[in-house]
Design a protein with these regions (language model features):
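The feature marks the mature, well-folded catalytic cores of soluble enzymes
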Residues: 1-199
Length: 199
């Protein structure tokens, strides 16, 4: 073993050893961080604030009853003249009611669907939560709802239940963490409007 390999091996072992030891802090107790939204000017109506701030972020917000969801989606898609849809396996909508000449489920690796993904005109995704203080939708990227669904098509329809609006990023993340048995997912998207996605 040459000197460089020897130093690299020692460094690697030292770093890994420190990482293992860092998780064993005696007496450490996790606590929720202070919510910085206290410093943001908000209203007493998170839903209305959410809709206003989403509109400010260039979302086109539509409100509808669950019974009219597919009809509302069809109206939106028709207004753009789109007919090629891509969706995740976890969509949980009646796809027979969605007017699209072509519907592709994103349930395979991107390498197998690359040509289809980038030639789809619209997608439909579920948001886990909305954040009223920022007007953003929080999505959990997963195999059932790949991140690419919100990026590749020209139009991404984000479905958000009214009772899933939180007043801050911290409260939305804490709620998602509670939903996930105390652990956050490895990939979370905050969508703030067209071409404004952060993970």
């Amino acid at each position: 073993m040459n000197r460089i390999d020897e130093i690299s091996t020692k460094s690697k072992e030292m770093i890994l050893s420190r990482l293992k030891d860092s998780y064993k802090i005696a007496g450490f107790e996790s606590s929720n961080s202070i919510d910085p939204v206290e410093h943001v000017q908000t209203t007493n109506n998170p839903l209305e604030e959410m809709k206003q701030k989403m509109s400010d972020n260039k979302y086109i917000v539509h409100e509808c009853d669950p019974s009219a969801l597919e009809d509302t989606i069809n109206e939106i898609v028709a207004s753009y003249g789109y007919s090629k849809m891509i969706y995740g396996s976890g969509l949980n909508l009646n796809l027979d009611k969605i007017n699209a000449s072509s519907k592709i489920c994103f349930d395979k690796p991107i390498e197998e669907l690359r040509a289809d993904v980038f030639h789809r005109e619209f997608s439909i995704v579920h948001a886990e939560y909305g954040v009223s203080s920022h007007g953003v939708a929080l999505l959990k990227s997963s195999q059932a709802q790949p991140r690419m669904l919100s990026l590749a098509p020209n139009l991404c329809i984000v479905l958000l239940k009214k009772d899933r609006v939180k007043n801050s990023l911290a409260s939305a993340l804490n709620a998602l963490k509670a939903d996930q048995n105390g652990k956050l997912p490895s990939n979370i998207l905050f969508i703030a409007g067209p071409s404004r996605t952060a993970d």
